[in-house]
């Protein structure tokens, strides 16, 4: 196998993984669970310090298994009943009794959450205080930086017990640094690599498909998927391929943001973006009668394409990543429909022309609306591309897909930092 292909597999396996709940509050739960494991006694106080962007993405989203919103309950639940070994599924086995105990800490004023200027968009430090049987106070502290589970330092009783070496478990945003990767290389890899090497990606279809079913069958969030289904049944809209994709994708996001106790297969630290990279591709695979192997290749194309595009700008920025994720999904949809590589590039260009610039104003139930908007753009871009229509040389969309991707990165890094600060100020007012 080519060295670059081995790197692609490593990248996918590093950042396409199951996650239970919105990954920003879950990062706090994970840090708290690791700290609790180290503490060795019952925690009686928590201090949580996070970056502005992690705070933004935790303000309005339900924490699975708790029925509650926010960083305080996420961290407290992680400290009381989290499983540090489970990573982003840290709260999978949380019990009602443990949630009640976590809430008691909050009600007693023993969970403090604050923001700080941080070196990375993803930053979380959790410090626990506890008392042993003799009444002696102990402390444990865990710091995450650059990734939702990337521990850079641990302390026990104020003594450093672990420090990540430089480059160890590198920050998520740098994951493609030094890797020979491009849209053309991704397309070649996805279509030519041995099927057995990528069979694992089919778990994305299974996990995110179950979330979609959950959102269709039960009331979560804004019920966008269920509302579309009701409108189809009422004859107000038809169940064509676009509406089915939007409905199924939004339903999965409804369930995720509404606190469903089911994991999503995430992408680049985002469950919604994992959903956006998966469900549209699965629906098109069903429409064209694709084989299991063809679906796996399309999912690899979609997920790795999304990772590559998103590596051009910081995670948790002011830019909603569902746009570029849906662009990668559109590329994969073209493949499933028998289109050419050139048409796949058209699809990416079309989607980025359609919806690039959508802002992120925090994780919340209405993220499902942005997911539905992006998935609709993916279908439009895909259908235009199948007819060999592609946007070129207009606005931020350049004459070739690689330059367009670089332009998006520049727009986010250089043009949207003030937007990000303004959004956080508005939300915190």
Curated annotation (Swiss-Prot):
GO molecular function: L-cysteine desulfhydrase activity
InterPro entries: Ser_deHydtase-like_asu, UPF0597
Pfam families: SDH_alpha
Domain of life (superkingdom): Bacteria
GO biological process per UniProt: L-cysteine catabolic process to pyruvate
Disulfide-bond pairs as recorded: none
Protein family: Belongs to the UPF0597 family.
Name of protein: UPF0597 protein AHA_1619
Annotated organism of origin: Aeromonas hydrophila subsp. hydrophila (strain ATCC 7966 / DSM 30187 / BCRC 13018 / CCUG 14551 / JCM 1027 / KCTC 2358 / NCIMB 9240 / NCTC 8049)
Organismal lineage: Bacteria, Pseudomonadati, Pseudomonadota, Gammaproteobacteria, Aeromonadales
């Amino acid at each position: 196998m080519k060295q670059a292909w081995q790197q692609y597999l490593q990248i996918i396996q590093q950042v396409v993984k199951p996650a239970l709940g919105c990954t920003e509050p879950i990062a706090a739960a994970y840090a708290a669970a690791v700290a609790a494991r180290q503490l060795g006694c019952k925690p009686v106080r928590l201090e949580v310090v996070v970056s502005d962007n992690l705070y933004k993405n935790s303000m309005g989203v339900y924490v699975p298994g708790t029925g509650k919103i926010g960083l305080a309950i996420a961290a407290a639940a992680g400290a009381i009943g989290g499983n540090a070994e489970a990573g982003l599924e840290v709260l999978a086995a949380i019990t009602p009794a443990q949630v009640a105990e976590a809430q008691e800490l909050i009600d007693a004023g023993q969970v403090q959450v604050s923001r700080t200027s941080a070196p990375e968009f993803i930053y979380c430090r959790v410090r626990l205080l506890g008392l042993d049987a003799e009444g002696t106070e102990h402390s444990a502290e865990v710091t995450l930086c650059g990734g939702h589970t990337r521990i850079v330092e641990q302390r026990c009783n104020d003594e450093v017990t672990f420090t990540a070496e430089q480059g160890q478990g590198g920050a998520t945003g740098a994951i493609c640094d030094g890797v020979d990767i491009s849209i053309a290389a991704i397309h070649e890899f996805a279509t030519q690599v041995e099927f057995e090497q990528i069979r694992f990606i089919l778990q994305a279809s299974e996990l995110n498909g179950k979330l979609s079913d959950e959102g269709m069958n039960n009331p979560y969030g804004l019920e966008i998927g269920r509302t579309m289904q009701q409108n189809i049944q009422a004859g107000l809209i038809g169940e064509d391929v676009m509406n089915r994709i939007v409905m199924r994708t939004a339903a999965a996001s409804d369930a995720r943001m509404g606190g469903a106790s089911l994991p999503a297969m995430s992408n680049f630290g985002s469950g919604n973006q994992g959903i956006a990279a998966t469900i549209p591709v699965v629906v098109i695979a069903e429409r064209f009668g694709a084989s299991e192997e063809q679906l796996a290749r399309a999912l690899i194309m979609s997920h790795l394409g999304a990772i590559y595009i998103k590596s051009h700008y910081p995670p948790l920025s002011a830019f909603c990543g569902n746009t570029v994720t849906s662009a990668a999904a559109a590329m994969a949809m073209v493949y499933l429909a028998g289109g050419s590589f050139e048409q796949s590039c058209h699809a990416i260009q079309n989607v980025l022309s359609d919806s690039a610039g959508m802002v992120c104003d925090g994780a919340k139930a209405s993220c499902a609306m942005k997911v539905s908007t992006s998935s609709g753009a993916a279908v439009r871009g895909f259908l235009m591309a199948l007819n060999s229509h592609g946007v070129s040389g207009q606005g931020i969309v350049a004459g070739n897909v690689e330059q367009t991707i670089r332009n998006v990165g520049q727009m986010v890094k250089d043009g949207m930092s003030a937007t990000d600060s303004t959004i956080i100020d508005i939300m915190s007012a």
